[in-house]
Amino acid sequence: MKISILSLFPELYETWINHSIISNAIKNNQVTIEIINFRLYTNDKHKKVDDYQYGGGAGMVLMIEPIVSAIRAIRTPNSYVILTTPKGQVFNQELANEFVSKYDHIIIIAGHYEGFDERINYYVDAQYSIGDFVLTGGELPSMVISDAVIRLLDGVISSSSLESESFNNYLLDYPVYTRPVVFEGHQVPDVLLSGHHKNIADFRKQQQEMITKKNRPDLYQKYLNSKK
């Protein structure tokens, strides 16, 4: 898979790309990541990428020309182009799985300032948000979306780890423990020390159901519906 991110601040991605699982995935040729500064695609001699909004209002708006030029320079017939914006559909694990199964090249546009000229929607395939809150720019959302997708690629993470993670089958992950057995009076549940695999599996499933029902009743209802 190839992921292209259009951003005004490419340097913000350096640590994310060069460490841990993402770095290993790049080294193992499981994913290619390119960060493109769309400021390079402006025809303005001052490299201007934003301007005042028509009708008045606070904040500067990203101009459409440099972004569209950047998209056209890298887009192929198989590319899926998405915009990060609080106005978009909320990105989730189901969409991450869908991206992996359907697309070989994802282009993510990370915005800044007051947002995009609305006409950008004629040149993208979808808009996505990572939650009901507003951030300074689209760099973090673009990393979040990319990270969620990359870790699902074959071989990036072991299949057993993926199977037990939160949101698999609409359930949040079960609690995990390590040494010491007792810390300041708080003890690891006895069942996890028993060595009885079925009892451990049952305990973990019960914990998943309980935690999901308490913290994410919306997901818990989906889980119940999936069992019908």
UniProtKB/Swiss-Prot annotation:
GO molecular function per UniProt: tRNA (guanine(37)-N1)-methyltransferase activity
CDD domains per the UniProt record, alphabetical: TrmD-like (cd18080)
A Gene Ontology biological process term: tRNA N1-guanine methylation
Gene3D superfamilies: 3.40.1280.10, tRNA(m1g37)methyltransferase, domain 2
Annotated transmembrane regions: none
Keyword vocabulary terms for this entry: Cytoplasm, Methyltransferase, S-adenosyl-L-methionine, Transferase, tRNA processing
EC main group: transferase
Catalytic activity entry: guanosine(37) in tRNA + S-adenosyl-L-methionine = N(1)-methylguanosine(37) in tRNA + S-adenosyl-L-homocysteine + H(+)
Gene Ontology cellular component terms for the protein in this record: cytosol
UniProt cross-references to HAMAP family, sorted A to Z: TrmD (MF_00605)
Biological function: Specifically methylates guanosine-37 in various tRNAs.
Name assigned to this protein: tRNA (guanine-N(1)-)-methyltransferase
Organism: Ureaplasma urealyticum serovar 10 (strain ATCC 33699 / Western)
Chain's gene name: trmD
